Amino acid sequence: AGFYVDGNTLYDANGQPFVMRGINHGHAWYKDTASTAIPAIAEQGANTIRIVLSDGGQWEKDDIDTIREVIELAEQNKMVAVVEVHDATGRDSRSDLNRAVDYWIEMKDALIGKEDTVIINIANEWYGSWDGSAWADGYIDVIPKLRDAGLTHTLMVDAAGWGQYPQSIHDYGQDVFNADPLKNTMFSIHMYEYAGGDANTVRSNIDRVIDQDLALVIGEFGHRHTDGDVDEDTILSYSEETGTGWLAWSWKGNSTEWDYLDLSEDWAGQHLTDWGNRIVHGADGLQETSKPSTVFTDDNGGHPEPPT
């Protein structure tokens, strides 16, 4: 048993609704920080960590031992691991998507058996163009390949347009969902200046997914971005109101141009930034709203057998 979606709700392996409250960590670029950063993120109250991995397309490939290590660290710290391949970011090419899918299949021995603690975010922000039809065609093609390989995990699919074109999910999400023989696919919007720029945009983008009975997470968001402000207060409050998960971007290590998105000044989380304090200690933040998956709680959600 593992995570599954039913309607617009994600459930854990014990059949309890699970609302992600977590943080992104750029593992692919800072491979030696996992043993420091992952426990530090858990200490902030995160129930989920989204882990950036590389399939070798743009950065040094993360091998199967690395995947085992980061999943184990997440589990030890009672966090669900959302694993994602970052190399296809913003790319429209089908070959980039296929490479990510081939990577998950290559790594399946580290993933199979972890369905209760791991969610597979197939490819970060694949399909940069604002074209929902071509985006959907790609995922309709590859989701069955993952299932044929024996990966039964909940799958997460980022919106087109660098994750910021939720119209792609509004128009074609149902088609992508129906392409999954297990009907265990959820969707992710990345809320920066376009998808999260003001309160009405935030609310409408969330409503138009969950009103179709599709499960949603805000897989990345910031407080501002290259071309404008982000309404992080509404992202947090409306996510809490609607039971929508969120994963803030990102723990540390953003390049100089985007270092305002660092949540912490150090990998160990001794010194949070203003952004970090907002996410951890602010209204509707981690301390207020994050609850661990029942697969990690002492009574295992009322089930006597602990997860293996």
From Swiss-Prot:
<dbReference type="InterPro" id="IPR001547">
    <property type="entry name" value="Glyco_hydro_5"/>
</dbReference>
<dbReference type="GO" id="GO:0016985">
    <property type="term" value="F:mannan endo-1,4-beta-mannosidase activity"/>
</dbReference>
<dbReference type="GO" id="GO:0009251">
    <property type="term" value="P:glucan catabolic process"/>
</dbReference>
<feature type="region of interest" description="Disordered">
    <location>
        <begin position="284"/>
        <end position="308"/>
    </location>
</feature>
<feature type="compositionally biased region" description="Polar residues">
    <location>
        <begin position="287"/>
        <end position="297"/>
    </location>
</feature>
<feature type="active site" description="Nucleophile">
    <location>
        <position position="220"/>
    </location>
</feature>
<comment type="similarity">
    <text>Belongs to the glycosyl hydrolase 5 (cellulase A) family.</text>
</comment>
<comment type="function">
    <text>Catalyzes the endo hydrolysis of beta-1,4-linked mannan, galactomannan and glucomannan. It is able to hydrolyze mannosidic linkages that are flanked by mannose or glucose.</text>
</comment>
<keyword id="KW-0326">Glycosidase</keyword>
<keyword id="KW-0378">Hydrolase</keyword>
<dbReference type="InterPro" id="IPR017853">
    <property type="entry name" value="Glycoside_hydrolase_SF"/>
</dbReference>
<dbReference type="Pfam" id="PF00150">
    <property type="entry name" value="Cellulase"/>
</dbReference>
<protein>
    <recommendedName>
        <fullName>Mannan endo-1,4-beta-mannosidase</fullName>
        <ecNumber>3.2.1.78</ecNumber>
    </recommendedName>
</protein>
<feature type="active site" description="Proton donor">
    <location>
        <position position="125"/>
    </location>
</feature>
